């Protein structure tokens, strides 16, 4: 999809619904899929390409004059966006921040660098980072911890086929975050805490989960906020009601931070 097509879609959504959207810009991390498309671009170069791609989108949406851009991967000449998008609807940009190349791309674009976090007590402080920072997690929380774990086990049972697929994906991905999570899963094998990688190990999702009581999960979320993370991308919940439980967690975390 050409950057102009993306910009046109964003502009159309803005005019139709008067709502701001966020764009999650992905460089691609599964080498076999890229090779099937005859895309042999190295990991860091893919982020350089992503910067060019996103820069054209940003310039089209932010400006009222024609856009000309000469890059290594993309070239446009006097390309105009009609109608222009209102300034208050300019999309936020999210970029993977798990690798140095991703962090550099986020900084170049003024984007939020999103990562897959370590357990809260091990997460490095990022408050001094140049870019805004966020994390992707799943949350299963209830008033009673045993209830939360019962739901977690029902939602993510052991899946041998999924485990084999996960192992294959480890061999074909050059994504820094995939390697980091896989290493942490191996190191924590046989243990069970609030930070839970079982869904990731069974190829059901690509992020860690926080499981436990409202108070316990909120304590972990509060620690991530104290580290400097301000954006939280949640794994897709199975039902609307699950969002109500998650909202209680964030309300509790905010209360902890104001004490």
Predicted regions and their residues:
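Active-site-adjacent beta->alpha loops and helix N-cap segments on the catalytic face
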Residues: 118-128, 241-244
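An alpha-helical appendage that flanks or caps ligand/catalytic pockets
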Residues: 37, 43-83, 123-223
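Alpha-helix-loop-beta-strand connector modules within alpha/beta enzyme cores
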Residues: 49, 53, 247-259
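Active-site beta-loop-alpha junctions enriched in small/polar residues
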Residues: 26-30, 98-100, 118, 136-142, ...
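Outer-membrane beta-barrel pore domains
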Residues: 207-211, 230-237
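Internal, glycine-rich beta/alpha segment that forms the wall or movable "lid"
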Residues: 2-112, 121-122
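Conserved beta-strand positions in the central sheet of alpha/beta enzyme cores
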Residues: 22-24, 114-115, 134, 233
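Conserved, well-ordered alpha-helix/loop/beta-strand core segments that scaffold catalytic motifs
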Residues: 220, 227-230
